């Protein structure tokens, strides 16, 4: 049997159909999940290449397998492009995910039982920053900081108080749902005061940092972690950066052989392509449009009477607080989904509602901006969202509003390109 002549449709019609239907779904909805984006055909081509066949444990020129000449070139390109993109001295492109990038830092710099200080999950932090169900909350003494109860902004005085009290070994900045800029210099000041390492997780804002639309943490943090998708618009994967090459050596050993085995060379090649795309001038214009679109989305939703957490956004994220409207995040997200608008339910700071229900929704602009949406289009999208939310408030059965908006979504989305 010659497998080299087989295609997916002939080999596995079930998976082939799933992929075709998912392509139809992605092309026909307004995608507002803040952690999602659409990668270029070039990135897809690299990720689906024969580099997936190559095992390459170790690092370039220090592999445990022969035949790594070409994949060494690919990884070196990814490393050098990442260093250029973020203007830093060290990069590791091997983490399979953002979570594993964070785990590698913990393995390199901490011992079980050490104290870490990160943003609480309900304030917009990430599972890997010390949440109880996560390994970071099980292996370490995890202390969490919250937001200011009046402004919903990061409370640096509270972080400093907690750092003085608990003396963490590692202070973490970063989030999965926070719409404002972070003062990395202040975080480093607090870390230095208590003798802690400072790690910045920029998974959501890596594209903003790379283009200068958000302060870079690399002048302040001992170590920076990120994903390579989201605003960076690359393949799903992780990335570790630093200007401290001694810490970089510890990270390398922690990641391999400490945490991972063979790197995914097809994904690393795709990361290299994405970094090359992000180094082009038009990528900065893209990120600026992402932010402008988020601002337009937040503004119209406010005009329609909805509470936007912190009163707006500095990045790609818009958090809608639905508590005063008597709508759960789950109800809103499901109704929007039926209307052709995809987002996610999201917890609101200091809200006691179950994370499976929530009192808010999180909206993001990267994916639709990739398809070509401008501010005027997000004005229309905001009105569509508000129409659905109005219906959720007024009627248990929201099917009439959902059908109306679905028709509007279908008409709008046809104007924007998708994969051929």
Swiss-Prot record:
Entry superkingdom: Bacteria
Site (Plays an important role in substrate specificity): 229
Swiss-Prot/TrEMBL cofactor(s): pyridoxal 5'-phosphate
SUPFAM superfamilies in the record: PLP-dependent transferases
A Pfam family of this chain: SHMT
Any one Gene Ontology cellular component term annotated for this protein: cytosol
Catalytically driven reaction(s): (6R)-5,10-methylene-5,6,7,8-tetrahydrofolate + glycine + H2O = (6S)-5,6,7,8-tetrahydrofolate + L-serine
Family: Belongs to the SHMT family.
Designated name of the protein: Serine hydroxymethyltransferase
Source species: Rickettsia canadensis (strain McKiel)
């Amino acid at each position: 049997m010659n497998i080299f002549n087989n295609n997916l449709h002939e080999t596995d019609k079930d998976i082939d159909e799933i992929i075709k239907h998912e392509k139809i779904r992605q092309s026909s909805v307004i995608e507002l999940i803040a952690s999602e984006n659409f990668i270029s055909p070039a990135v897809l081509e690299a990720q689906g290449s024969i580099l997936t066949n190559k095992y390459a444990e170790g690092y370039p020129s220090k592999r445990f397998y022969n035949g790594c000449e070409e994949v060494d070139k690919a990884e070196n390109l990814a490393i050098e492009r990442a260093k250029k993109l973020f203007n830093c001295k060290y990069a590791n492109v091997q983490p399979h995910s953002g979570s594993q990038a964070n785990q590698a830092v913990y393995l390199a710099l901490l011992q079980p039982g050490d104290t870490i200080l990160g943003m609480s999950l309900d304030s917009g932090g990430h599972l890997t920053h010390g949440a109880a169900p996560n390994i970071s909350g099980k292996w370490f003494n995890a202390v969490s900081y919250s937001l200011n109860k009046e402004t919903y902004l990061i409370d640096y005085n509270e972080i400093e108080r907690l750092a003085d009290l608990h003396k963490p070994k590692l202070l973490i900045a970063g989030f999965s749902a926070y719409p404002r800029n972070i003062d990395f210099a202040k975080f480093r000041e607090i870390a230095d005061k208590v003798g802690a390492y400072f790690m910045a997780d920029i998974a959501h804002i890596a594209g903003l940092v790379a283009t200068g639309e958000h302060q870079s943490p690399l002048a302040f943090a001992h170590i920076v972690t990120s994903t390579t998708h989201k605003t960076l618009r690359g393949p799903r994967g992780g990335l570790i950066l630093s200007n401290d090459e001694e810490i970089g050596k510890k990270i390398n050993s922690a990641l391999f052989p400490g945490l991972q085995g063979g790197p995914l060379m097809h994904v690393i090649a795709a990361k290299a392509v994405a970094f090359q795309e992000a180094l082009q001038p038009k990528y900065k214009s893209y990120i600026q449009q992402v932010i402008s679109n988020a601002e337009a989305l937040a503004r119209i939703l406010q005009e329609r009477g909805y509470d936007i957490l912190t009163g707006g956004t500095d990045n790609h994220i818009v958090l809608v607080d639905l508590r005063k409207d008597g709508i759960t995040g789950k109800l809103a997200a499901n109704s929007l989904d039926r209307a052709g608008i995809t987002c996610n339910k999201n917890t609101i700071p200091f809200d006691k509602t179950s994370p499976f229900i929530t009192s808010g929704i999180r909206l993001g602009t990267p994916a639709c901006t990739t398809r070509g949406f401008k501010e005027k289009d997000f004005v229309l999208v905001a009105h569509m969202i508000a129409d659905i939310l109005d219906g959720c408030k007024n009627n248990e059965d929201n099917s009439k509003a959902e059908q109306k908006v679905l028709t509007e979504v279908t008409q709008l989305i046809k104007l924007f390109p998708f994969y051929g």
